[in-house]
Design a protein with these regions (language model features):
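Iron-sulfur-cluster electron-transfer modules
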Residues: 2-132, 139, 271-280, 302-308, ...
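Alpha-helical membrane-embedded segments
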Residues: 21-28, 127, 161-162, 196-232
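Juxtamembrane/interface segments at transmembrane-helix termini
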Residues: 29-47, 99-102, 132-153, 169-180, ...
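Membrane-interface segments at loop-to-transmembrane junctions
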Residues: 48-49, 71-76, 108-118, 142-162, ...
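Hydrophobic alpha-helical membrane-insertion segments
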Residues: 80-90, 155-175
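Ferredoxin-type iron-sulfur electron-transfer modules and their immediate structural context
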Residues: 213-341, 715, 720
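Local cysteine-cluster metal-coordination motifs and their immediate loop/turn environment
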Residues: 281-296, 342-356, 432-436, 465-477, ...
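Short, flexible loop segments at boundaries between secondary-structure elements
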Residues: 522-545, 582-588, 642-677
Length: 725
């Protein structure tokens, strides 16, 4: 039987027809891929060319082995059948396009039957995978796909099924070997395969391939091209570790005094790293990130999958301007939406479940850095949400804790524990802000110290010399403040000779143990208190734990999923009787991370969602007592004192300042504004009673604050400028 390419159609050779089809489809495909590549390479520099061994291992596991895809067993099996099948059958496309020259002349005769069998296995695998996927989409539609257009996905599946079925017909016309090509042999025996049928099957096969090549770069199936580099250039840093503003040639963070940056964070497409931009084309639209996002589940504006789609849609819409080096009028933050940017809890559940290693969170934290350090202005839709956070930032600047409580009270929780304070010790217990000032958390800190002393450990605390680790400031986008806090704490550690730190707070555990390494904390060992307790139990220095009643455990994001510690907390309490529906690496975020603890919450849905996960496991009713967060005082005052606010806003012009000075001016301006406004507010007795007592809004404190800020302002402005207030 003649090969279809050797047949003439209306006097035109099949070779010429295939040449035209191939040139058009391959040319279009190549153009679109190179366009996407050019748009990706417009991104900021990002060194992802280190650790080649780790990258090859990750590629073999995640891309070739489909490890993350298989974490969803239903969709995973279907995708693996299609993926591995497509890899095996792709070589046959070249053979068919060459008129079987590849298999006849380039492959050794002994290998040819095995290769034919592998190709048939590939077609069979892909066909089964597509059939199952199509049935799932049409007959058993998952909840996350309902209400969404599935035309594109269904068309792609039908095209692949067409490629596979026509391949079996072509194979049947070539006289298949029943030992290796069982399906082709069955088709040949069951049906009458003529030259005409083979010709029709061949051209249907080729048209389906050409159509597929047209659709790939225009659809979500561009991930067939971009997923491989996306996985290979994954972030080898620990999960959730944020990068410093600037690093030197040794990879160490540049000190605040030596920073040389034109802008902070990212508001423009080209300010995102090139690796971050690949994500837009590598996304498979599987919606796994959407399924695990606590912000999305609680009804907020953030959809992590949409953030990734926004990167690609923004690039395509503004491609001409971007390639000319011009900035579009719309920035990337506007495309994301400020409400989405501020809704992220940085739990990294989206990053953890993504089958192609997409990095969602850095895009949002870079946007926060720009909003917090560069603009210092917020959209009206998020103003009432973010304003309490601004008060927290100011408290961190003045008192090194988010509550605004004086630093000299930081060690009061351990006053009667007979523990070393700011003295050398084998273990330093880093209490953190919550355990230092919150009554409920103080008990955790006191019990931890008691356990360590019972085990005979040499333990101390830093007392008033301890400062906030800076997690909230960094996740809020105030990298400048975080770096100040980090450098101050590291100086204290060096002065006292700290080598081992124990922390009860998962956020402090991550920040001190992972992120401080960029600032000089490489030689400090940091452990969670549950890890230490478990270690002491194994050594026999502590008795085996016992508990009565049914108990469960909620894995904190920054200890479990991000820190990788899942067993120590369970072992320390003697095991759990029942696991929640979402536990371990899949634990559902409590909603307080990413500085959300210090933002105004307009809905309790996220809290009730978390509680419902525990209640569904037949536990006794879960109760929680949430402290009332102070209302946005500045927002309220803007309504009560509009003339005063406007007068202060018009006092300072910042255009003449350099970048670094300008940021300091912005902070000082807001601090002075806050002081005067709240001083005016304190004149009203009814308003004083509304303020939470733990914020210490006493007149004497305000007088001291006025004097402190005046001294700081004078010290900064005397260098270059005279600021008149």
């Amino acid at each position: 039987m003649q090969h279809p390419l050797d047949v003439s159609y209306a006097g035109i050779s099949g070779w010429y027809i295939l040449l035209v089809l191939g040139a058009v489809s391959i040319g279009f495909f190549t153009y679109q891929v190179q366009k996407a590549t050019r748009l990706v390479l417009l991104g900021a520099k990002d060194n992802r060319f280190d650790s080649w061994g780790a990258r090859l291992k990750e590629t073999a596991s995640v891309w070739l082995g489909q490890r993350k895809v298989l974490e969803d067993p239903v969709a995973g099996v279907m995708h693996v059948l299609m993926f591995w099948g497509f890899l095996m059958l792709s070589t046959d496309m070249f053979d068919l396009a060459s008129g079987n020259r590849f298999s006849e002349h380039l492959l050794p005769e002994a290998i040819n039957p095995l290769w034919n069998g592998m190709v048939e296995l590939g077609y069979t695998s892909a066909l089964i995978g597509c059939f199952l996927a199509l049935n799932r989409r049409v007959l058993f539609t998952p909840e996350k796909l309902k209400g969404k257009s599935q035309l594109e996905g269904n068309v792609i599946l039908l095209l692949i099924m067409t490629i596979c079925t026509t391949a079996f017909v072509i194979e049947a016309g070539e006289g298949p070997d029943p030992t290796y090509e069982m399906i082709g042999a069955w088709v040949a025996e069951t049906f009458t395969i003529t030259q005409s049928i083979v010709n029709w099957a061949y051209w249907a096969h080729m048209l389906a391939i050409c159509t597929f090549m047209f659709l790939i770069p225009l659809s979500k199936h561009m991930h067939l091209v971009m997923a491989l580099p996306n996985v290979f250039f994954f972030d080898t840093q620990p999960m959730a570790k944020m990068r410093p503003l600037q690093v030197d040639e040794n990879g160490t963070a540049v000190s605040l005094d030596d920073l040389d940056l034109e802008t902070f964070g990212a508001s423009q497409y080209t300010q995102l790293s090139w690796r971050s931009l690949i994500d837009g084309w590598a996304c498979t639209s599987c919606a796994r990130c959407q399924d695990v996002c606590p912000a999305y589940a609680s009804g907020k504006d953030l959809n992590p999958m949409q953030i990734i789609h926004d990167v690609r849609s923004y690039a395509n819409e503004h491609s001409q301007l971007l390639m000319k080096g011009e900035a579009p009028e719309e920035d990337i933050i506007s495309r994301f939406g400020e409400s989405a940017v501020w809704a992220c809890t940085t739990c990294n559940a989206c990053v953890d479940v993504c089958p192609v290693n997409i990095e969602h969170v850095p895009k949002l934290t870079d946007a926060r850095r720009h909003l917090m350090m560069e603009r210092m202005e917020f959209d009206e839709s998020v103003e009432d949400t973010v304003m309490p956070l601004m008060m927290t930032i100011e408290n961190l600047e003045s008192d090194s804790n988010p509550y605004g409580i004086p630093m000299h009270e930081r060690g009061d929780w351990a006053a009667d524990l007979d523990v070393k304070v700011a003295e050398p010790a084998e273990y330093i217990y880093f209490a953190g802000c919550a355990a230092s000032f919150d009554e409920r958390n103080k008990k955790v800190a006191r019990d931890t110290i008691s356990i360590m002393k019972e085990a005979g450990l040499d333990v101390g605390i830093l007392g008033m010399q301890e400062g906030c680790s800076g997690d909230a400031a960094r996740r809020a986008g105030h990298e400048y403040l975080f770096q100040m806090l980090a450098e101050t704490n590291l100086a204290t550690f060096e002065e006292i000779g700290v080598k081992k730190i124990v922390s009860s707070c998962p956020h402090c555990f991550h920040t001190l143990g992972t992120e401080y390494k960029d600032f000089g904390g490489q030689d400090i060992e940091v452990m969670h208190h549950s890890q230490l307790i478990n270690h002491l139990q194994d050594e026999g220095k502590l008795p085996e734990p016992k508990h009565d009643g049914k108990i469960t455990y909620h894995d904190p994001c920054y200890l479990g999923r991000i820190g990788g510690e899942l067993e120590a907390p369970r072992a320390a309490i003697g095991g759990v009787d029942v696991e929640t529906e979402n536990h371990g690496r899949g634990s559902f975020c409590c909603g307080a991370g990413g500085a959300q603890m210090w933002m105004e919450e307009h809905s309790m849905k996220d809290t009730t969602v978390s509680i419902s996960f525990a209640q569904r496991n037949w536990l006794q009713p879960v109760q929680t007592q949430l402290p009332l967060v102070a209302r946005s005082v500045l927002l309220w005052l803007q309504m009560a004192y509009p003339q005063l606010v406007q007068r202060w806003k018009s006092k300072i012009s910042l255009k003449s300042f350099g970048n670094k000075s300008r940021q300091m001016m912005l902070r000082l301006r807001q601090q002075r504004l806050r002081l005067e406004l709240l001083s005016s507010m304190l004149q009203h007795k009814c308003i004083r009673q509304l303020l939470p007592c733990h914020l210490h809004f006493q007149r004497r404190s305000w007088l001291e604050s006025h004097q402190w800020y005046n001294r700081r302002l004078s010290r900064h402005t005397s260098r270059k400028h005279l600021l008149r207030l």
